[in-house]
């Protein structure tokens, strides 16, 4: 989108209002502003703001007060940063160009399949900031009601790759992994990266923040080391240490994905086609050639049946093959959380316990890591078929994984210990018996109500596993919160929902 300030359109003086609106550009104008009247600009309409050769499309709000003087316009942080202006600079306001790709969204709402050019236009306009949250919600909802077919998924993946930057590596094999999610804990990625890099593989891992879970890999890793790496820094870290764990949103790799994720989080949806396009577009952009996908299967996991898992694996493999990727899917146990911690800092403590070979390190996390890392080592050609799990365990027990992890953290900006919550409350068993069911979804919801992932120290520390014998009054879990209000909110939820851990005599 190109435009320049012209003498024909009156200019307004820019005022920085320091409003944070989740990356959404917002502007405030007076209701009696001559530009609003001349251009016919209505409240909550989209407007184009021009400053020199820079532009940004923003949501307009109008005010009837002296907060703004005549001839002024106030901009949110997102709009201010996009224009790169200074206090008092002159800007112009116009109607934005017609959003032609929106017709394809309307067609998709009515059940029409989208072609390559239509999806490319939608993704380009999304990245250019031309889609409102309402329009984004319409597109994502349309692809949830009538799921993307194979060709649409391939086209969307390609479109998401094409609008971003790409990393290229000298190594012929570049490995990566992804977990489909829906399972609390299961923080294998930092460990798998350390194991892979310690064995000579290249693994530039870019991870996301939480969408609907209490913690994403980037949230957890951020409690241990900086993750906001730019492309140059990421490249230097990987060239030096062989691997990294960085937040993908800090770079321009598949930038549409970060925008889609923000809306998906608010809608609390995560559809198969979008999931595949999200995962593979980021892997392709990061330069991966060989990928392991962990698909936990369980009644309260994201994937609830083996049939659904096989369907997802088939579609992942088909889309991956169309881009020349080598992909292996693992079906893993999704009946209960992996590790004890649920929430960024608590999951990080589990990671450290395994890396440091601590006596009380969660064995299930160690075993899950060995399974996933073993597949990565075999796929990457540094372990023979069937020997990957043994090599992964040896890399941990020998201390090589811990040494490599510390070096990666140092290269990313320095290692730090994860924070501790200010408030901790036990949740006690109300009866004696055996733990026969753990509701993953209720656990995740509870951890989020306690403040995770926004409060990194918040979450849950689980004390029981399926099959454990429990006595009345025993701690089933510890609830961690950073504020008394969040703790009270979470405890009220526990009171309302009944058993999270089902105990039978």
Curated annotation (Swiss-Prot):
It holds the Pfam family PYNP_C. PROSITE patterns: THYMID_PHOSPHORYLASE (PS00647). It comes from the Bacteria. GO terms for molecular function: 1,4-alpha-oligoglucan phosphorylase activity; thymidine phosphorylase activity. GO terms for biological process: pyrimidine nucleobase metabolic process; pyrimidine nucleoside metabolic process. Keywords: Glycosyltransferase, Transferase. The keyword Glycosyltransferase applies. Its EC number is 2.4.2.4. It catalyses: thymidine + phosphate = 2-deoxy-alpha-D-ribose 1-phosphate + thymine. The keyword Transferase applies. One of its GO terms (cellular component) is cytosol. Belongs to the thymidine/pyrimidine-nucleoside phosphorylase family. Type 2 subfamily. This is Putative thymidine phosphorylase. It comes from Parvibaculum lavamentivorans (strain DS-1 / DSM 13023 / NCIMB 13966).
